[in-house]
């Protein structure tokens, strides 16, 4: 699905230099690269504060810890998302309230959030799924009306830009109270292991997040609040500093692959190309087709037999996962998510794809779709 080796080879001189410098310094934890990366990412994203942490899941957990929510408080999340979005909410004793997504963009919609608000609702988590922003203007309006915190899950959309109706623009993860992102190796900005970060415009929240990510201490061995151990290590920060200047180019390369796929598949029976959200750019962390009348398992098997991997994000929506099952969430509760889970499939997309590779995938997919019967 992605070729991390080829990207690393292209950036190898800078990566080698950065890694060797960290090894020579011996500053593997809280070394200078961590602060420098935070400052550089903040400048790139146009946000006051970036707080690096160990991974994207920790970023979400730290966000809810810092907001001071109490057990039993409700947090609205889309039912069609990666499990981490709801996982941290449940771990903290909060109640994830699931809502269905838009059938076109697969994103959380303001109307669905408003319908799910109760007196116990304290926050909402817009997920910028697959590389484009949720409709933040409407979601922020609903959040303001009901006095809700907004925690953006931008793990898949770093570098995506949202345009408000007045012409203002903002980066994914910078519009709510806190934005969370991941630097998992396959992400658009990925390190050589696990990594994550929080973003906020709020000075007080930034200070608290920084403290909570380091065992709740501002001064070593003096713990003012309960925290966790969630630090981005120096080696990963150094790698990310090398990659960050290429982030916009990474997006353009992915967009070029997506454009080729779009042109090839837009009029093909049995598949629907990704629908772009009107207010957001799309950085294509995933290129996800929606199959219509095509046997997905057979489709994937045929592609795999020809050397083309595919993935399903996500095969089981949250309400049908054992860990999040509830009596009031039976099969059929969220029909859009259930349909998507049965019919989406993602094609290879990454920064190092060559024209002949893209064309091979296009030609092969065309051949398979002419052979597979449509329901």
Where are these regions (language model features)?
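N-terminal "arm"/small-domain region of PLP-dependent enzymes with the aminotransferase-like
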Residues: 1-27, 32, 306, 348
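PLP-dependent aminotransferase class I/II
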Residues: 5, 34-40, 44-48, 111, ...
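Pyridoxal 5′-phosphate
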Residues: 10, 72, 254
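Phosphate-binding glycine-rich loop
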Residues: 25-74, 88-92, 98-100, 165
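Hydrophobic/aromatic ligand-binding patch that stacks against planar heteroaromatic rings
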Residues: 88-89, 142, 171, 188, ...
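Active-site PLP attachment segment
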Residues: 174-210, 217, 237
């Amino acid at each position: 699905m992605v070729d991390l080796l080829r990207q690393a080879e292209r950036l190898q001189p800078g990566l080698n230099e950065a890694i060797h410098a960290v090894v020579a310094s011996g500053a593997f934890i809280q070394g200078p690269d961590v602060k420098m990366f935070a400052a550089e990412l903040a400048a790139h994203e146009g946000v006051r504060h970036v707080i690096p942490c160990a991974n994207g899941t920790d970023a979400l957990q730290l966000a809810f810890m810092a907001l001071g929510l109490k057990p039993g408080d409700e947090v609205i999340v889309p039912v069609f998302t990666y499990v981490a979005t709801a996982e941290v909410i449940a771990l903290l004793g909060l109640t994830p309230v699931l809502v269905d997504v838009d059938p076109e963009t697969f994103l959380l919609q303001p109307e669905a959030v408003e319908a799910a608000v109760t007196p116990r609702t304290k926050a909402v988590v817009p997920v910028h799924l697959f590389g484009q922003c949720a409709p933040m203007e409407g979601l922020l309006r609903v959040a303001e009306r009901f006095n809700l915190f907004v925690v953006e899950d931008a793990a898949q959309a770093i570098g995506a830009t949202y345009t408000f109706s007045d012409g203002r623009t903002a980066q994914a993860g910078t519009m709510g109270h806190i934005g969370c992102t991941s630097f998992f190796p396959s992400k658009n900005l990925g390190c050589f292991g696990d990594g994550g970060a929080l973003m906020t415009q709020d000075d007080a929240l930034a200070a608290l997040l920084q403290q909570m990510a380091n065992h709740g201490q501002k001064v070593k061995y003096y713990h003012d609040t309960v925290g966790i151990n969630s630090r981005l290590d120096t080696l990963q920060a150094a790698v990310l500093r090398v990659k960050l200047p290429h982030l916009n180019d990474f997006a353009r390369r992915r967009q070029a692959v997506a454009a080729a796929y779009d042109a090839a598949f837009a009029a093909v029976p049995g598949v629907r190309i990704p629908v772009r959200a009107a207010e957001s750019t799309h950085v294509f962390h995933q290129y996800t087709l929606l199959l219509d009348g095509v046997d997905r398992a057979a489709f994937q098997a045929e592609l795999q037999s020809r050397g083309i991997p595919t993935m399903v994000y996500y095969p089981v929506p949250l309400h049908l996962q054992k860990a999040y099952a509830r009596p009031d969430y039976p099969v059929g509760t969220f029909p859009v998510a259930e349909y998507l889970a049965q019919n989406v499939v993602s094609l290879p997309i990454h920064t190092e794809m060559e024209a002949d590779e893209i064309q091979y995938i296009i030609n092969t997919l065309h051949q398979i779709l002419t052979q597979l019967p449509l329901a």
